Regions:
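Membrane-proximal intracellular helices of multi-pass ion channels
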Residues: 1-485
Length: 485
């Protein structure tokens, strides 16, 4: 039986945390003497009051979660956080439409980065900061953040971690999950601070550096300029952005082992990291060649633009330093492939994940060997660890579901009159949490405001399923989930 009281208790506490973050946005609005301060004060009061009501309902709950409770909690938290997160937009009037406000907020928390705002530069500083902060909070997971700072709040935190973490294997760097969470969030914070200081040193003002550092390390992609990082016309800023997008796409557990424990060889021997680097290098060289020969770019510009877009798409950040929509169409195919693949599991990026790519390639290799040696027992090993059959079954289930969901959503959009290329890349972008799309109607530098409202409501759960890796959400719609036994 689902324990709704403990779920409400945890959601109530999390809404207090969301109200706390809104307070910082209100401070930002007051500092800049802008009109959005009222919107944030009202929003945080609504959020805080609602959190109190949730806590009131769950006040006598036992502090323990079952596996079913964990799945329902994680999905509910992301939906409810997005619901309350849209209030600053609606109250201020920067987004007047409820559909657009919820879409923008869901896109923010899931770090998709698809925006319906045509001109972000007219927004006040508090609203801009809220957009960036949403992505930074969602980067490693809302509930995972809570496990790090308030471990006693989430009973059964291992089950919650399994429901919210990305990748087929949920690695822990310490026997205590709370310690793991604190270390991972420490690395995340260090990356964010280092990124912000680098941007500031390269010429950004403090507000620009703060916002771009949060959306870069969260691999979210929201920008405070319409032209994203292209606004600065600075190769130095481009290379800084590339560096921190790339680092944020690496498994944070691997970063911890390599940097904190000084085991540098572990990162070079890691199968997932090697595939990640290989895809980035291969795709960059291919696009660099195409830009040099077909667009007459000089070598440095071709290398920088190709590397930026490849890293941006594979880490599912979605920032841009040039309009890739004007590039040869073959580059769209390359970017579409890396967009679907994604970076490493256990990072802030979305997508299929390189670890699943490694597993898939090894299964295919073993299948060829099995044809030649029918009686051979061929285990799938990754980094010296045998992958159980259940994980391989889950791999193919996940792969099949992502393809089916992409095709289903694309078909609906094509019927709605959206061109084929846009329909496919929009679906891929949402299920992989990338943000930009490729096509003639909506390009990588355009907003998604032209989409019909009902399409936006279809894309919202798609973004959520992409962030929680599908199964966590879809299991709620199975009959067995709601059976008492």
């Amino acid at each position: 039986m689902i324990n709704f009281r403990i779920i409400c208790k945890i959601i109530g506490s999390l809404l207090f945390i969301e109200a706390f973050f809104m307070t910082w946005c209100a401070v930002m609005a007051i500092y800049f003497h802008e009109e959005d301060q009222i919107a944030f004060l009202m929003s945080l009061l609504i959020t805080f009051g609602s959190g109190f009501l949730f806590l009131l309902f769950g006040r006598n709950a036992e502090n323990a979660l079952s596996r079913k409770d964990a799945f329902l909690l994680v999905t509910a938290v992301w939906v409810i956080f997005s619901f309350f997160g849209m209030f600053p937009f609606l109250i201020h009037g920067s987004i007047a439409n409820l559909t657009d406000a919820y879409f923008e907020t869901m896109s923010g928390f899931t770090t998709t980065g698809a925006s319906i705002i045509d001109d972000v530069e007219v927004l006040p500083h508090g609203i801009l900061f809220w957009r960036s902060l949403m992505q930074w909070i969602g980067g490693l997971g809302i509930v995972f953040f809570t496990i790090a700072i308030l471990p006693s709040l989430v009973g059964g935190s291992v089950k919650v971690f399994a429901a919210e973490a990305t990748g087929p294997v949920k690695a822990k760097m310490h026997p205590r999950l709370t310690t793991t969470a604190k270390w991972i969030w420490s690395i995340y914070l260090i990356l964010t601070v280092a990124c912000g200081l680098s941007f500031w040193t390269a010429g950004m003002n403090w507000f620009e550096a703060l916002n771009y550092s949060m959306t870069t390390t969260a691999t979210g992609g929201f920008a405070i300029h319409n032209e994203s990082t292209e606004y600065f016309h600075s190769p130095t800023i481009d290379y800084i952005s590339i560096t921190f997008q790339f680092l944020s796409g690496i498994n944070f557990t691997l970063l911890y082992v390599s940097i904190v424990k000084l085991k540098f060889k572990s990162i070079l021997k890691n199968s997932e990291f090697k595939l990640y680097v290989s895809v980035v290098v291969g795709a960059t060289l291919w696009i660099m060649y195409l830009l040099s020969t077909r667009m007459n770019y000089d070598l440095e510009r071709a290398f920088r633009c190709a590397l930026f877009q490849v890293v941006s798409f594979i880490t599912t950040t979605g920032m841009f330093n040039e309009d890739a929509g004007t590039w040869p169409h073959i580059t769209w195919v390359i970017l579409g492939v890396v967009m679907y693949l994604g970076a490493c599991a256990g990072s802030t990026s979305g997508g299929f994940k390189c670890i699943r790519g490694v597993m898939l390639l090894k299964v295919i290799r073993n299948n060829f060997r099995q044809i030649l040696h029918p009686n051979a027992v061929l285990p799938v090993k990754i980094n010296g660890t045998n992958i159980p059959q259940s994980k391989l079954v889950a791999l193919f289930a996940f792969f099949t579901l992502t393809i089916l969901m992409t095709l289903f959503t694309s078909t609906i959009m094509i019927v709605a009159g959206i061109d084929n290329t846009n329909a496919i890349t929009i679906a891929l972008s949402c299920v992989s949490n990338v943000g930009p799309t490729l096509g003639t109607q909506i390009g990588p530098v355009m907003s998604w405001s032209v989409l019909p409202d009902y399409i936006k409501w279809i894309l919202c759960p798609l973004m959520l399923m992409g962030r929680l890796e599908i199964m966590t959400v879809l299991v709620l719609f199975t009959r067995s989930f709601w059976k008492e036994n």
